[in-house]
Design a protein with these regions (language model features):
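Membrane-interfacial helix termini and adjacent extracytoplasmic/periplasmic loops
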Residues: 145-185, 249-262
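N-terminal signal-anchor/first transmembrane alpha helix
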Residues: 1-62, 68-79, 88-89, 95-102, ...
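Generic hydrophobic transmembrane alpha-helix motif, especially the helices
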Residues: 108-110, 134-166, 230-243
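Non-cytoplasmic
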Residues: 155, 188-194, 232-257
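Glycine-rich helix-loop "coupling/hinge" segments at transmembrane-helix boundaries
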Residues: 64-67, 71, 170, 247-276, ...
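Glycine/proline-centered hinge or cleavage motifs at structural transition points of membrane proteins
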Residues: 213-214, 227
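Short hydrophobic alpha-helical segments within the ABC transporter permease transmembrane module
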Residues: 194-198, 220-233, 237
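Membrane-cytosol interface at the C-terminal ends of specific transmembrane alpha-helices
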Residues: 47, 146, 172-211, 237
């Protein structure tokens, strides 16, 4: 009797626990269904807006379609992709794009983190400081690019005058440096804003406890602040990297892609709107889309485990 009673009494909590888990599971499923229902309208609109251009671009990339000879359009399969990938122009454009992306995003991350910490820690004139920092980001990119172009114009530009009327936009290396500088000046504030939001996720109690334990400011930053900021870092780096990889306006205004400064977006634009070759231009666009998808996948794999709502 004792054994049976023991079995019964030890079995009841297990049954109750299983029922409780089942109820939680049903509640979680209901919450998930509600989430999908709330997201569905936006997803439908996004698919309607984005799906047709994407599939139409894929279809064009499989055609020999030159607007100068529209009657000669025909299906040629993946020949356009072969032509693009075997062209030195594509690989040069990809190399230039990667240089601009890696350098600008790396510098923006460091400067953005410093600005984020400064804005987050500043108690006085915090609103004024944030407004000043965000001014460059609020300026239209084309207008800012024309400002940079004027500043580096020999005999008239103030920055050119500081360097003995130099003309950096006429040489590949210095032109890329000016383009990267324009990118950094424009979008560091965006990076700082996202990282500052991440700083608010770090509990002050942890910082105080680490300070009491004798941890230095650098140790607290490396072992507490950065790990807890990973979700914000993912968003900041992902958004900014994808934006930098598609760089177009600064290059178009400053150099128009001349002197070997053309990016993959400039190359696609030239083929689509100047050469009127929709087949090659669409193939370049799809390759850019694939590169962007690969970059997004890499970032999510590297930082995704730290994002809210993910496990392990």
């Amino acid at each position: 009797m004792t054994a049976e009673t023991e079995a019964v009494t030890t079995g009841e909590p297990q049954v109750t626990e299983r029922k409780h888990r089942k109820r939680l599971s049903e509640g979680a499923r209901a919450e998930r269904r509600l989430g999908w229902m709330l997201c569905a309208p936006a997803v439908v609109v996004m698919i309607a807006v984005a799906a047709f251009p994407i599939f139409y671009a894929i279809w064009l990339s499989l055609q020999r379609y030159d607007l100068r000879f529209p009657n000669e359009a025909k299906f040629i399969g993946f020949s356009n992709y072969g032509a693009v990938l075997s062209s030195p122009y594509w690989w040069h454009a990809l190399w230039v794009t990667l240089i601009i992306t890696v350098v600008s995003v790396a510098v923006e991350f460091v400067l953005g983190m410093l600005l984020a910490i400064l804005m987050f820690r500043t108690l006085f004139v915090r609103g004024t400081l944030r407004t000043i920092v965000l001014i460059p980001y609020g300026i239209v990119t084309v207008a800012a690019a024309y400002g940079w172009q004027y500043a580096w114009t020999p005999n008239t530009g103030y920055l050119s005058a500081l360097f003995n009327n130099s003309a950096p936009l006429t040489k590949t290396g210095t032109a890329l440096a000016v383009i990267i500088l324009a990118e950094i000046w424009k979008t560091t504030a965006f990076m700082a804003l996202l990282l500052m939001a991440g700083l608010s996720l770090v509990p002050e109690d942890l910082q105080k406890a680490a300070r009491v334990d004798g941890a230095t400011a650098w140790q607290r930053f490396i072992r507490i602040t950065l790990p807890l900021m990973k979700p914000a870092i993912l968003v900041a780096l992902l958004f900014r990297t994808l934006d930098a990889f598609r760089v177009f306006d600064n290059i178009y205004i400053l150099t128009a892609g001349g002197n070997g400064t053309y990016s993959v977006s400039i190359l696609g634009y030239d083929n689509l709107f100047r050469a009127l070759n929709l087949g090659i231009g669409s193939a370049i666009s799809i390759l850019i889309f694939i590169c962007v998808a690969i970059i997004a996948f890499i970032f999510i794999r590297l930082f995704g485990a730290a994002a809210p709502g993910t496990e392990g």
